[in-house]
Amino acid sequence: MELASGTTLVAPQPKGILDPATGKPIGSNDAFFGEINNELADKGFLVTSTDELINWARTGSLMWMTFGLACCAVEMMQMSMPRYDAERFGFAPRASPRQSDVMIVAGTLTNKMAPALRKVYDQMPEPRYVISMGSCANGGGYYHYSYSVVRGCDRVVPVDIYVPGCPPTAEALLYGVLLLQKKIRRTGTIER
């Protein structure tokens, strides 16, 4: 996050039960906490809620695991190469599901591969997110009417972001990653 020079960081307004006499949250006029807050403000500290700090850390260090099943995986690999450099957004690849926050399902999901997808998804720690990449992962795509194809990976795992295209470009996938980061910032650490 880049700030213009000379701007002041301000913590969000405190939430809580409002005092009917003053219209401010209870405890906001407490002299002890007011003094501590003023001392910290003079020394250059930032006071914020833990929830916002955790969300900031989660969006800046997303580790993704590939589940490349078809040609979309080539575009997924291209996204992590120097031209697009997904790591500048804090989105780095990992090979193990136990170290991953995000799974990118790229390509045609067959009926035989569906249990493996679910098993890998179950091995990921909470909170975990899924990006469905391409027409085949979104809804079966070109092979929609085949007997052996799952018509969308959302029938096997919950999907957070859908990236359309056949295959979607690396820019489209990068935009999906940015949308996922925005979604994580909007939701709290407890709820999903």
Swiss-Prot record:
Quote the cofactor binding remark. Binds 1 [4Fe-4S] cluster.
- Binding positions for [4Fe-4S] cluster per the UniProt entry: 71-72, 136, 166
Going by the UniProt record, its keywords in alphabetical order are: 4Fe-4S, Cell inner membrane, Cell membrane, Iron, Iron-sulfur, Membrane, Metal-binding, NAD, Quinone, Translocase, Transport, Ubiquinone
- InterPro entries cross-referenced by the UniProt entry: NADH_UbQ_OxRdtase-like_20kDa, NADH_UQ_OxRdtase_20Kd_su
> Record keywords: Zinc included?
no
How would you describe this protein's topology in the membrane? Peripheral membrane protein
Question: Where is it chiefly localized?
Answer: membrane
- Detail the disulphide connectivity of this chain as listed in its UniProt entry: none
Cite a single Pfam family from the UniProt record: Oxidored_q6
GO MF: 4 iron, 4 sulfur cluster binding; iron ion binding; NADH dehydrogenase (ubiquinone) activity; NADH:ubiquinone reductase (non-electrogenic) activity; quinone binding
The top EC class, named as a word, is: translocase
Stated family: Belongs to the complex I 20 kDa subunit family.
> Which NCBIfam families does this one have?
nuoB_fam (TIGR01957), PRK06411.1 (NF005012)
Q: Which cofactor does it need?
A: [4Fe-4S] cluster
Q: Name one GO biological process term.
A: electron transport coupled proton transport
As recorded in UniProt, its EC number(s) are 7.1.1.-
Single GO cellular component term: respiratory chain complex I
Q: Where found in the cell?
A: Cell inner membrane
Report the protein's function: NDH-1 shuttles electrons from NADH, via FMN and iron-sulfur (Fe-S) centers, to quinones in the respiratory chain. The immediate electron acceptor for the enzyme in this species is believed to be ubiquinone. Couples the redox reaction to proton translocation (for every two electrons transferred, four hydrogen ions are translocated across the cytoplasmic membrane), and thus conserves the redox energy in a proton gradient.
SUBUNIT field: NDH-1 is composed of 14 different subunits. Subunits NuoB, C, D, E, F, and G constitute the peripheral sector of the complex.
User: Under what name is this protein listed?
Assistant: NADH-quinone oxidoreductase subunit B 1
What reaction does this catalyse? a quinone + NADH + 5 H(+)(in) = a quinol + NAD(+) + 4 H(+)(out)
